[in-house]
Amino acid sequence: MKQCISILISGIMIVAFSCKVNAQGCVAIRSTGGICTMDHHSEQMDTAQKWEFNLNNRYFKSFRHFVGTKQQKQRVENGSEVINHSYTLDLTLTRHLNKWWSVSVDAPILANSRSSLYEHDGKNRFLTHSFGLGDVRVSAYRWIFDPAKSKGNIQVGLGLKLATGDYKYQDFFHKNDSTVVLGPVDQSIQLGDGGTGFTTEINAFYSLSQSVSAYGNFYYLVSPREQNGTSTARGGTSSATSIKIGSNVMSVPDQYMIRAGVNYTEKNLTLSLGFRDECLPVHDLVGGSKGFRRPGFILSAEPGITYNFKKINIYAYVPVAIERNRTQSVADKIQTKLTGVYTQGDAAFADYTVNVGFTTKF
């Protein structure tokens, strides 16, 4: 029974480690790093395995535009859609201090490309890119209940998200046949958000039977900084309208994720099916919410598979979007108030995200 629970929880938390709120497109929910260290007590009490390393690969392609929940199908039909390709390599090292406490550090490496017409001359499609270290996160975790005495448990975590990613990354924009300007790339492919943030996590599991368990994860990033000063003019001059509504510089938004689901384990193989909600809210909990942001959320069904090789777990999880919603931003609301005409911007979303990786103990 203990071994089954151990495999189940390892499979559950591998993805909690590596899938902390990440974008599926222009809603710029980027990798914030992080591993939660929830393993079963039989592994936690093994003093010979105090270290844990997780490597996660994440990829998505976003190209379907939404205003609210309404898809703008004409964007794909007329070839004006924005296409983002996003790859993240998350490297996370965890130290188990004892059966109660653990600490971790995560370093995401990002490689992004963005293809569009409107950012350039409006007629031809060009690419902008970004590559480098993202925002590093350090965290501490503790079990609520004694891991040795329960078939379910709750783990809480607090962390610090550092502004290590370049939030003013630049590339060239083609304005016409003879003019190319250098400017900050779109917010959705910036390597960081420029703010120091604070994270809180709750991770839980409960074994329903020898083979079936339930899990849940909650993650929230608090970003006190309101704006990071990065221009949204792509190397040009900000318009009077963008300055008036505050969208001329990039915002530093909060973000959160909620996951819940069930797992079925047979020997070393675990199959899971869950629900996932990723959100970049309109308003932050702390600090202001002005500046340019594309708020919204993605609701996904999340199937997954994990296989245990004693000290190594390999896994694949593929959240598939079932609802995408680009909500009205603060800048949209200000413009609506100033003009009397309802304004709500769009955002491009992916159909699915691929997460593949492994965790090993030593």
Model-derived features with residue positions:
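Bacterial Sec-dependent N-terminal signal peptides
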Residues: 1-26
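Outer-membrane beta-barrel biogenesis signature
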Residues: 21-68, 72-74, 145-155, 163-168
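Residues on the lipid-exposed face of transmembrane beta-strands in outer-membrane beta-barrel proteins
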Residues: 43, 55-57, 91-95, 105, ...
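Repeated loop/turn-to-beta-strand initiation elements of outer-membrane beta-barrel proteins
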Residues: 51, 101-103, 147-149, 211-214, ...
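Surface-exposed strand-loop-strand hairpins of Gram-negative outer-membrane beta-barrel proteins
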Residues: 59-88, 119, 188
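Outer membrane beta-barrel transmembrane domains
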Residues: 66-75, 221, 226-362
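Short sequence motifs at beta-strands and strand-loop junctions characteristic
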Residues: 80-86, 128-134, 190-196, 250-254, ...
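Outer-membrane pore/translocation modules
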Residues: 112-249
